[in-house]
UniProtKB/Swiss-Prot annotation:
Residues 3-496 form the Peptidase M32 domain. A motif (HES/GQ) lies at residues 294-297. This is Carboxypeptidase 1. Coiled coil: none annotated. A motif (HEXXH) lies at residues 265-269. Binds 1 zinc ion per subunit. It comes from Bacillus subtilis (strain 168). Belongs to the peptidase M32 family. One of its GO terms (biological process) is proteolysis. Its cofactor is Zn(2+). Homodimer. Zn(2+) binds at H265, H269, E295.
Length: 501
């Protein structure tokens, strides 16, 4: 048979996987945006079956045969086909090591655990979730033994989200970050030059917040012909296919920042997905390069655009019009200082730019302890609370504002959290390079012209999908290896100026 016949069959299998994945993504989206609770058990079974079907295709004998044949003629393949075959081989080898029945059991457990987590969070009762968490951890410990690792068991999980990143790499990066940020947080907390934020928590109608969320998505370049905005408990963006990338947010009438910045954050994720090269659609390359690269895009939009004074120069009046009494006597400068306030807080997704990395480092250190067998599930809440006291000087009073605040563990996503901090580092380095290429960056924000910024990010990051590894994307885009100093310098300069340190 000609090589292109094998290629076609290989890509047909990838296309079939993408169809199943779309159905699973739709059910996940539905379950988190108001699907009837009574259907959760059957829905979990459906998700489990479809996920097993995907697993079976990825680990089928035919997939292995096609990968082997294409590897024999590797030099004759196009660059994209080479990348797709390499990725399929990696996934095959990872998945083949997990027994099929065990994988299906795990997927069903994840779906049930998410439902249990939602109830536990609502009641602020860790004991309702801990039996599921115990099982999820045991599954992942078994997976680690199946996959193997070189230095640290946690490396096997980190590689799922951020290929090439290890405990050794993160320990070094996070040590440098902690050394710079913890003293800065203490200085900011002790500063007498704090912004007035009293107006932030005044009533801001939910409907007006929704209108603004829709407006900012449109302005920033999100394509509504290929997406929609919905409400959820824990905001996320999800991709059904390149033409259907959905965004969710959460409204709080006593704090408009939750919805506005949450929406802008998810907008960054969605714009990434909407601008991956169309040629990759239906393949395993039509996805973000890694969780960290994905997070770099959401944090870039949320922080480097959304919290920038130049962004609010043309748009502050929209906020004033939406809630006139609340903002009547508040100047633009006072507004910008208030939305950039830094103070230790319990909730990661609502943390300010300065303290945010510490929320991630806490989760990293706890997950590392879990998979080093240094902590039991029952001791996790107290370990969590102790680290918040040590790093941020505060202690959560309830499980909901402590260990139950994130959905990640319920979905089995151990090893995901470090990607948020890496994404922040990636974003700071990309911003530095963008300022060289687009010195008019601030002027573009003041004019509400986001296309050149989006275009730069698309060319350097979005279009490549999974063609490149995360660290290669950063090196190719910026001309140097990942450097944590860009983030440290950005935070030091910004908060020293804001708090007159």
């Amino acid at each position: 048979m000609e090589i292109h016949t094998y290629e076609k069959e290989f890509f047909d299998l990838l296309k079939r996987i993408s169809h199943y994945s779309e159905a699973v993504a739709l059910m996940h989206w539905d379950s988190r945006t108001g699907a009837p609770k009574n259907g959760s058990e059957d829905r979990a079974e459906s998700i489990g079956q479809l996920s097993t079907d995907i697993f079976n295709i990825q680990t089928s004998d035919r997939m292995k045969e096609l990968i082997d044949v294409l590897y024999e003629r590797f030099d004759d393949l196009s660059e994209d086909t080479k990348k797709a075959v390499e990725l399929a081989k990696k996934e095959y080898e990872e998945n083949k090591k997990i027994p099929e029945a065990e994988y299906k059991e795990y997927v069903i457990l994840c779906s049930k655990a998410e439902t249990a987590w939602e109830e536990a969070k609502g009641k602020s009762d860790f004991s309702l979730f801990s039996p599921y968490l115990e099982q999820l951890i045991e599954f992942n410990k078994r997976f680690i033994t199946y996959w193997g690792y070189q230095e640290h068991p946690y490396d096997a999980l980190l590689d799922l989200f951020e290929p090439g990143v290890t405990v050794k790499v993160l320990d070094q990066l996070f040590a440098e970050l902690k050394e710079a940020i913890i003293p800065l947080v203490k200085q900011v907390t002790a500063s007498g030059n704090k912004p007035d934020t009293s107006f932030i928590t005044k009533a801001f109608p939910k409907e007006k917040q929704k209108e603004l969320s829709l407006y900012f998505l449109q302005e920033l370049g999100y394509d509504f012909d290929g997406g929609r905005l919905d409400e959820t408990v824990h905001p996320f963006a999800t991709t059904l296919n390149r033409g259907d990338v959905r965004v969710t947010t959460r409204y709080d009438e006593k704090d408009f920042r939750t919805a506005i910045f949450g929406t802008i954050h998810e907008c960054g994720h969605a714009i990434y997905e909407q601008n991956i090269d169309e040629a990759l659609s239906g393949t395993n390359l039509s996805d973000g390069a890694s969780m960290g690269i994905h997070e770099s895009q959401s944090l870039f939009y949320e922080n480097f655009i959304g919290r920038n004074k130049h962004f609010w120069t043309p748009y502050y009046k929209k906020i004033q019009e939406a809630s006139p009494v609340q903002f009547k006597d508040i100047s633009l400068d006072d507004f910008v200082r208030a939305i950039n306030e830094s103070k230790p807080s319990f909730i990661r997704v609502e943390a300010d730019e300065l303290t945010y990395p510490l929320h991630i480092i806490i989760r990293y250190e706890i997950e590392k302890a879990i998979f080093s067998n240094e902590v039991s599930v029952e001791d996790l809440p107290s370990l969590w609370n102790q680290k918040y006291q040590d790093y941020l000087g505060i202690t959560p009073q309830t499980d909901a504002e402590g260990i139950l605040q994130d959905v990640h563990w319920a979905g089995g996503d151990f090893g995901y959290f470090p990607s948020y901090a890496l994404g922040y580092m990636y974003a700071a380095q990309l911003k530095q390079k963008m300022l060289e290429d687009l010195p008019e960056f601030d002027a573009l924000l003041e004019r509400g012209e986001f296309h050149p910024i989006k275009q730069w990010l698309t060319e350097k990051v979005h279009i490549h999908g999974k063609r490149k590894k995360p660290l290669d994307i950063i090196k190719d885009a910026t001309g140097e290896e990942l450097n944590v100093r860009y983030l440290i310098d950005y935070l030091s300069n910004k908060y020293s100026n804001l708090y007159l340190l």
